[in-house]
A protein has these predicted regions:
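Extracellular S/T/G-rich loop segment that most often corresponds to the catalytic His/Ser-adjacent loop
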Residues: 151-154, 185-215, 340-426, 430-434, ...
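Subtilisin-like serine protease catalytic core
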Residues: 110-156, 168, 185-276, 293, ...
């Protein structure tokens, strides 16, 4: 086990590719075509030595970088003295966004103190935007979008009139397409867009280019700027944050703010963005705010349940650092996990039995158990048919495999790491036979051996990644904030139900000890 690498990355590297492909999370960040990993690192000094070894380096802010590393060189990265810690990307899921008049925007935007966002940059990192809507325009019809960076549209040398793509962009482009293939809607030399400075992917469109496109016919616009919000999620988020109708009947929180839009993600089968793409988007927004000399608000409406939820991951620390640069505020949604049955918390002196319902047709499922390193538990896992096995928790780190009924279980026991305060025991369930893991009630029994705090937390993947029938019995609604809303220096925004005048039941919740709380409920 390499203690510079996070636990789930160690497990991924120790697991054969054919098994990783069966899991929900272990293969995220790996390109089978180029046989390379995309990795997030915390570093100091210079990374020029890695560049000389065919490793692509994207420096971000505050000593963070994204590396694209041939799998044979991952050990080289870990052994580099300048590298402090390494994580793999995580897949992020959309968080619910329902606008509601109960948020009371109009009273503060239309009269004293006129908090309408004028003179402020609002960066929305999401699924894109329907950029020609009137709600994102000024009174004269011109756009309020200063920059639109679509990470999914490659800037390619095969299109006449366009500059050659960099080596980094060639490495990072969509691995599912041949290197010289461009999607039909991206072909043609329009004279619009370019790869943004300092980034190897995507196409950036300026305010001037968007206005030129707006002055063309409706049919021509998306031929000039082919960026589309296919899900509508990003458009809804931007509308809540900064929308404004021409008649003034609809207004968002900051109807006069200027916008930076980042459509996240390289085109890929699962369609969800990764940690790395969010970090690129945050860095891009910070650089634009510095260039324009404007205060910046960044909105993130994505979340993931993987992690100890204590602010210690590289993404959480990255956002804490980003919030200290210039005049920057970062707002993150509290997610939809409050009522999703994806979390169970207990104390070994009181709760020794955890029951998990697994619905039909689950192709894989992972379970995280987080506890104090000083606590020692005896853990037994029982399958729906009654077959039972004890987990060997006395192994010092590393992976092993066991089988219960028709389900193979990859077990990883974490060791102390520089950026991990709690110990992780990670279980990844994949089919041993057939296409699905065993449905029914799985039981986890915990027995104390050495107790210091006795506290433990269990997490499943975010609700968007599992079936509705899968979840813990007696689930715990507390500590269901998704990462990165658990970062210490972001504003976490919860959901409020005006019909019942209460906190929305689906909205993620924080810790009962009040050290980490929801900043706003709207």
């Amino acid at each position: 086990m390499d203690q510079k690498l996070e636990n789930i990355l160690n497990l991924a590297l120790e697991t054969p590719e054919e098994e990783r492909e069966q899991t929900e999370s272990l293969n995220v960040g790996y390109s089978a075509e180029s046989r390379s990993w995309e990795l997030i690192v915390k570093y100091h000094g210079s990374l020029d030595g890695l560049r000389e070894q065919n490793i692509v380096v994207e420096e971000l802010i505050a000593g963070y970088a994204i590396l694209t590393v041939p799998e044979t060189l991952v050990d080289t990265v870990s052994e580099t003295p300048e590298i402090e810690y390494v994580e793999k990307p995580k897949r992020f899921y959309y968080q619910q966004t329902d606008p509601d008049g109960a948020s009371c925007f109009p009273p503060v935007t239309r009269r004293t103190p006129f908090l309408n966002g004028r003179g402020v940059l609002l960066a929305v990192l999401d699924s894109g935007i329907t950029w020609d809507l009137e709600v994102f325009r000024k009174a004269d019809g011109s756009t309020r979008i200063r920059y639109l960076w679509d990470q999914t549209i490659p800037w390619d040398q095969t299109i006449p009139g366009k500059q050659a793509a960099s080596r980094e962009q060639e490495t990072l482009r969509n691995p599912t397409l041949p290197q010289n293939q461009i999607m039909p809607e991206e072909t043609g030399d329009t004279g619009y867009g370019r790869t943004p400075d300092g980034f190897p992917i995507g196409t950036e469109y300026t305010e001037e280019e968007i206005n030129r496109a707006l002055n063309s016919s409706v049919l021509e616009r998306y031929g000039l700027i082919p960026s589309r919000d296919l899900t509508g999620h990003g458009t809804a988020v931007a509308g809540i944050a900064a929308g404004r109708s021409a008649d003034g009947l609809y207004t968002g929180a900051a109807p006069e703010a200027e916008l930076i839009i980042v459509k996240l993600g390289l085109p890929r089968e699962e369609g969800f963005p990764r940690t790395t793409e969010i970090m690129r988007g945050v860095t891009y927004a910070l650089r634009k705010a510095r260039q324009l000399n404007m205060p910046l608000v960044i909105n993130l409406s994505f979340g993931n349940s993987y992690g100890s939820h204590d602010g210690s991951s590289l993404l959480e620390r990255f956002l804490d650092n980003a919030s200290e640069i210039g005049r920057t505020v970062i707002c993150v949604g509290s997610g939809n996990e409050g009522a999703a049955r994806g979390h169970f918390a207990g104390n070994i002196t009181r709760d020794g039995r955890v029951e998990l319902a697994v619905g039909n047709y689950e192709r894989n499922l992972n379970i995280q158990l987080w506890k104090n390193y000083s606590d020692v538990f005896r853990i037994r896992l029982q399958a729906p048919g009654g077959e039972e096995a004890e987990l060997s928790t006395n192994i010092q780190g590393g992976k092993y495999t066991l089988e219960l009924e028709q389900t193979r279980i990859l077990v990883y026991l974490g060791e102390p790491l520089p950026y991990a305060v709690a110990q992780e025991i990670y279980l990844d369930m994949i089919p041993a036979e057939g296409s699905y893991i065993n449905a029914g009630i799985w039981t986890i029994r915990l027995e104390p051996v050495v107790t210091v705090t006795g506290q433990y937390y269990l997490y499943l993947p975010a609700g968007s990644g599992i079936g509705e029938s899968t979840g813990f019995y007696r689930a715990t609604p507390q500590v269901t904030l998704p990462i990165p809303s658990t970062a210490a220096k972001v504003i976490t925004v919860g959901a409020y139900d005006p019909v019942y005048d209460t906190y929305a039941d689906f909205s993620g919740r924080g810790y009962a000890d009040s050290t980490r709380t929801i900043g706003v409920a709207a």
